């Protein structure tokens, strides 16, 4: 907990905002930088006590300049504190405006410009991807390819964000995998909305193949209801006092980072996917979402 009342009030605001997982990580970055800026006495004294004063231009101007210089990084990069990237700078500005708007303050748009969205696949590419996945299902697949095929099929039906897909559980699937329940978490915050989405024949078949693989994995790990699970033994990444970490067996819940990594690796590993999948899962999501909206009109 921060020693500054303004940052403690910011923590409460972040909890109430209900932002999606990706946006929350970005907001937490800004929160940490603001706290470090206050610890350096780099902001006006009033910003220590009042959240509104912390989010006024008098405090945010110096904060943004200091943060962009790299001085407020929470860890060193190759022994130094280099300036943050333009993409990070733009994320920071967006988060600042989001926080101000949550308090009823107008957006500042402190310098910089919008980072253009990476291009999303066309509708024809989505159809070609579905055909490629169907070809995979017609033959033998490794566990990793089976999981990725099911994940991509679900994405083509739902246009789910990575965080929304990662938290899916087996009880979010309808009878015979004919539907999937997904909770929408708006990136900028707002009410969470859930919906049942009818699945395609491709998705039903892909989920059936994956659930057979998943069953054996989960039994070894003593059970979980999470839909996506790990395929290999790994560790939790937390070191104890002796420098050791807890070993996790295969079949443990796959977190969002692991899900995104499986997408990136699979895009390069399996024949046909590099030409059909964009670099990032989010680009695929936007393409599917746009296609769904076109179909609905």
What are these model-predicted stretches?
Residues 155-178, 297:
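Short, charged phosphate-coordinating catalytic segments
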Residues 16-107, 199:
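Non-catalytic DNA-binding core/recognition domains of DNA-processing enzymes
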Residues 13, 33-34, 99, 210-213, ...:
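Conserved hydrophobic/aromatic "anchor" residues
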């Amino acid at each position: 907990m921060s020693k500054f009342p303004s940052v403690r009030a910011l923590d409460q605001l972040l909890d109430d905002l209900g932002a999606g997982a990706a946006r929350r990580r970005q907001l937490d970055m800004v929160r940490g930088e603001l706290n470090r800026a206050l610890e350096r006495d780099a902001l006006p004294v009033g910003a220590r006590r009042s959240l509104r004063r912390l989010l006024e231009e008098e405090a945010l101007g110096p904060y943004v300049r200091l943060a962009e210089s790299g001085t407020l990084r929470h860890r060193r990069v190759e022994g130094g504190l280099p300036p943050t990237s333009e993409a990070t700078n733009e994320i920071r500005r967006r988060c600042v405006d989001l926080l101000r708007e949550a308090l009823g303050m107008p957006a500042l748009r402190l310098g910089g410009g919008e980072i253009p969205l990476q291009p999303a696949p066309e509708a024809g590419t989505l159809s070609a991807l579905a055909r490629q996945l169907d070809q995979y299902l017609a033959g033998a697949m490794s566990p990793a390819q089976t999981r990725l095929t099911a994940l991509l099929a679900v994405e083509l039906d739902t246009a789910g964000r990575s965080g929304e897909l990662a938290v899916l559980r087996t009880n979010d699937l309808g009878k015979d995998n004919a539907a999937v329940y997904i909770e929408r978490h708006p990136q900028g915050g707002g009410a969470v909305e859930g919906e049942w989405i009818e699945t395609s024949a491709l998705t039903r078949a892909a989920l059936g193949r994956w659930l057979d693989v998943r069953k054996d994995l989960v039994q070894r790990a003593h059970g979980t209801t999470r839909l996506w699970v790990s395929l290999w033994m790994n560790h939790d990444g937390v070191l104890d006092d002796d420098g050791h970490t807890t070993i996790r067996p295969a079949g443990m819940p796959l977190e969002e980072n692991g899900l995104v990594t499986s997408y990136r690796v699979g895009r390069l590993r399996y024949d046909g996917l590099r030409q059909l999948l964009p670099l990032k899962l989010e680009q695929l999501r936007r393409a599917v979402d746009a296609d769904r909206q076109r179909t609905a009109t």
